[in-house]
Amino acid sequence: MTELSKYRNIGIFAHVDAGKTTTTERILKLTGKIHKIGEVHDGESTTDFMEQEAERGITIQSAAVSCFWKDHRFNVIDTPGHVDFTVEVYRSLKVLDGGIGVFCGSGGVEPQSETNWRYANDSEVARIIFVNKLDRMGADFLRVVKQTKDVLAANPLVMVLPIGIEDEFCGVVDLLTREAHIWDDSGLPENFEIKPVPADMVDIVEEYREMLIETALEQDDALLEAYMEGVQPSIEDVKRCIRAGTRTMAVFPTYCGSAFKNKGMQLLLDAVVDYLPDPVEVDPQPLTDEEGNENGEFAIVDVDAPFKALAFKIMDDRFGALTFVRIYSGRLKKGDTILNSFTGKTERIGRMVEMQANERNELESAQAGDIIAIVGMKNVQTGHTLCDPKHPCTLEAMVFPEPVISISVTPKDKGGSEKMGIAIGKMIAEDPSFRVETDIDSGETILKGMGELHLDIKVDILKRTYGVDLIVGEPQVAYRETITKEIEDSYTHKKQSGGSGQFGKIDYTIRPGEQNTGFTFTSKVVGGNVPKEFWPAVEKGFKSMMNTGTIAGFPVLDVELVLQDGAFHAVDSSAIAFEIAAKGAFRQSMPKAGAQLLEPIMNVDVFSPDDNVGDVIGDLNRRRGMIKDQNAGVTGVRIKADVPLSEMFGYIGSLRTMTSGRGQFSMEFAHYSPCPNSVSEKVVAQVKERKAAEAKK
């Protein structure tokens, strides 16, 4: 078993195409985990092992790989860069202790890099910066360093300087040791020499070395004071200070190279060992009560403590059902019985494996700090806590974003329904941001996701992985409804047709609620006009109607109901009568309270070459976008805008056309906003048309 101080649980994350997966491949090659390097552009990379990943050259799932470097165990997670798969980045960050942020040497800080960086900041994950692709046309290491300061508000600590640039890039100077690492053109990582600093770089190396040491020593007042008085610190002292600053995110050690050409990778791996924290150095995960509130206890990373682990990913592959877990405390052995604190059920551990992407090694045991996969677990989902049955506990839960886009899918043949149902069940377990429901009116299966690419991939998996031939509907926007004014109203439910009748009268106030509160209910009834035992029925009845608004049948947001008074009948009143009264009150009062249709607004971040900025901004304006910010860079302009999701379908194609393929964008959900009347009328008409068509079937 590896000592905890020698564990490094790290993620690699960046913008699409900055070279995350290639960087991971090189790490595996250097650590001896793979013999033939797989290239993303050949569809052969080790961590991109889904068909869809290999074909599209992007990472969709977070693949966990274990490897060793200088007696240290690395558990490496290669995360997606595409915005539709940020849920994978989020849940990876939940179980990581450190990370490598990869940036393109020519593209710099691109839209999705910023999103992932923000997520990592929120999760307080220490990081190293790696500026990749310095062999590319237009690469500029120091420009990208400046962008990380200006755009990400990071404090990059330059550890190396490149020797040459673009097609003349051949190596790096290690500022601490004042040594030049120079590779030949064979593309083999081991083919390098250590030489003195090139004569034309001596001055700039000394300048940046002095900045490096001064910044590092800010972590230790005594060393800094001695340095100011002329005492040179040892390299070990400087490294210790850098490690302390990295752990608190005061600095981000910054390296550069070309992963594709195998240049600069060894220094990056050394930096993971030297500067990223081990599991014990990271703040322990909080434990919570049944309501999800922190209870003041923590999952201390300790091999001898009771077992605690978080299931952070479920995957069904050719090996069977795999549950990826991060072990925080204790040990786990084959044959052990563990408790799922969410379900309250125990399970016996049959097989455990250590993953090398799509290969795996059988394990007899695992311990705190490990990221492993358990084979064949039942009734476990992402975010569930697994623990010692004698010491039950719950780790802080994962929260996933709500889907903003949906499509309908129907099997082409009758026999496909059962196959599709089984497949979708597995896919939901694997991806918490993927939701499925059945349309009440049409009976169609509705897939919901985070964006067009997200759902494209899901449909592709259904067709190719599970062999379900599908008819796919047009993408639909997740509209919502709300109210705009406060009204007082009254509703009576009365039914008498022989036997015992039904009677319930409620007087109430309905008003717009605070944003993101959903539905809130309070009662101000004094006396016995509506007995207290019927109040929950009123709340239940009204709340049950919130899923279907009165404008176009979309879910309703942020409504407050106050029960003021009412009346009941000693014989005919019941909970069901008051529940029905509340449902009738909803239908009656929503239009009176100024019911309004809401549409999802997206934060859109676009990069445009200088020549195309006018076209791109004009196009965003036509899409009802509101431009919030423009920042000129060396290679183009970053434009930030709020744009309705309904206007963003097919945007990537339009952007590529306008910019000759050079434009890039990312988007994420921002908030709901009232629809203009013209849009509202169009949406209502489309809903009526669809329902009429379904009625004829």
UniProtKB/Swiss-Prot annotation:
- Cell compartments where the protein resides: Cytoplasm
Q: Where does GTP bind?
A: 14-21, 78-82, 132-135
List each copy of the tr-type G domain by range: 5-280
GO biological-process terms attached to the record: ribosome disassembly
The UniProt keywords, alphabetically, are: Cytoplasm, Elongation factor, GTP-binding, Nucleotide-binding, Protein biosynthesis
Q: What PANTHER family would the database entry show?
A: ELONGATION FACTOR G 1, TRANSLATION ELONGATION FACTOR G-RELATED
Fetch the HAMAP family from UniProt: EF_G_EF_2_B
Family note: Belongs to the TRAFAC class translation factor GTPase superfamily. Classic translation factor GTPase family. EF-G/EF-2 subfamily.
Q: What is this protein called?
A: Elongation factor G 2
List the lineage, top down.
Answer: Bacteria, Pseudomonadati, Pseudomonadota, Gammaproteobacteria, Alteromonadales
| Gene symbol of the encoding locus | fusA2
